[in-house]
Amino acid sequence: MVHEQYERFTETVECADRMSEFLADAAEICEDAPPGVLGQMNITTAADNDPHAPLNRYLTIVGNEPVDRFRGVTPIVSRVFNESAEAVLGENTGMELVVDRGVLERSMDAYPDSFERARELDQFELRIAEESLDFGLLVVDGHAVVSAYDEHNNLTALVDGDTPEVVSWVESLYESVRSKSVPIDRLEP
């Protein structure tokens, strides 16, 4: 019994160490993660010699073929994210994206044509959160991602996985953010 507890403790310490860069910017959203979920996830961090590693991992996960369902949260405006979402949007893709008011305003200013095209798509729902968002997430066709951003909104790390426990946890994070958002059409000025 003591040995089993020690083994669990050791696994927890090893997981926390492996996830330290992610947890430095995303610890709060992980507080309610079910035991063992973080240990099932891959981690990708930015490094001096590979500062875009998390972004590249995101692009690999999203791919470039149409997906069935795409649900995401983003605290930033990114041409790369916009283009990757556009690449996987097919005729039958169900897509939801939650952003905060700041991201909405920056999107409308920086990418007005893309913003209008997205608004015209029947299968795309843009939702606006009242509270400022400080992490990102994505659930796409059985794969889940949570991304961490520093105080300057730079993507520092992401964790991802496709086990049922991981996908379920990230879906619950998504639903918790979504439940506090409204479709853009119902947004009060």
Predicted regions and their residues:
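Basic, amphipathic "hinge/linker" alpha-helix immediately C-terminal to the N-terminal HTH DNA-binding motif
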Residues: M1-V13
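Generic secondary-structure signature for well-ordered alpha-helical cores
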Residues: E11, C15, S176-S179
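Helix-turn-helix/homeodomain-like alpha-helical modules used for DNA recognition
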Residues: E14-E65
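Primarily the HKD phosphodiesterase
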Residues: R57-F115
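Short acidic/glycine-enriched loop/turn segments that link adjacent beta-strands
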Residues: R79, S132-D134, N153-N154
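Generic beta-sheet signal
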Residues: V98-D100, A129, S147-A148
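HKD-type phospholipase D/PLD-like phosphodiesterase module
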Residues: G102-V140
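Amphipathic alpha-helical interface segments
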Residues: V139-P189
